[in-house]
């Protein structure tokens, strides 16, 4: 199973590198923004096409990396009794890959929202430039500007929700990690009890004695209650 782990680890690193390259390409769409008013619709349309292509590719890679992390977690959990799986470095690697995935998700959403806002403004400016002499279309452009401001508020709310979701995912990951540790402890105790029958026998005797003491205590309490009730009646 260690071979499977190494294969998944290499695949995770390769996917992370691909996401990193795509994020650079996405951020370049913002860096290449004109920032002025001499923008034509053809240029904006081309940039929007590139934006859709890059975001689709990044979302696919993030989903792929999520599945790889889940597979790594399953492999480590299934082999919690193996010596290599108990190595602290394995748990550190799992935690590090989850942190990288979470960081990539945050960075992608931030870059996506920024580029989307820039492209929407450029589209508005390009429409305004072409229809500057048309008062009806100018009024429509002002309506678009109000829409963009409202969209900025919505995006701000989305970012707050993303932060809350990230906190929830972090809590889920911590619980999953604790579950793996508990399964490992349970497995080791099971192996110890099989390896050392004397310990297993001692645990069984302790359990039997506790049950016997519980029965004796229950009998004494019942007798006292019966005697008390009988004494009250008479």
UniProtKB/Swiss-Prot annotation:
It comes from Caenorhabditis elegans. One of its GO terms (molecular function) is SNAP receptor activity. Component of several multiprotein Golgi SNARE complexes. One of its GO terms (cellular component) is cis-Golgi network. Involved in transport from the ER to the Golgi apparatus as well as in intra-Golgi transport. It belongs to a super-family of proteins called t-SNAREs or soluble NSF (N-ethylmaleimide-sensitive factor) attachment protein receptor. Cooperates with ykt-6 for proper expression of Golgi-resident proteins. Required along with ykt-6 for normal embryonic development, seam cell division or differentiation, and ray formation. Disruption phenotype: Reduction in brood size at adulthood. Abnormal tail structure, and loss of the T-cell derived rays, R7-R9, of the male-specific sensory rays, but ray sensory function remains intact. Combined with ykt-6 knock-down causes reduced seam cell leading to loss of ray phenotype. At cellular level, reduced expression of Golgi-resident proteins like mannosidase II, and more so in combination with ykt-6 knock-down. The keyword Transport applies. This is Golgi SNAP receptor complex member 1. GO terms for biological process: endoplasmic reticulum to Golgi vesicle-mediated transport; inter-Golgi cisterna vesicle-mediated transport; protein transport; vesicle fusion. Keywords: Coiled coil, ER-Golgi transport, Golgi apparatus, Membrane, Protein transport, Receptor, Transmembrane, Transmembrane helix, Transport. Residues 54-121 form a coiled coil. Pfam families: V-SNARE_C. Residues 1-212 are cytoplasmic. The chain crosses the membrane at residues 213-233. Residues 234 are vesicular. Belongs to the GOSR1 family. The gene is gos-28.
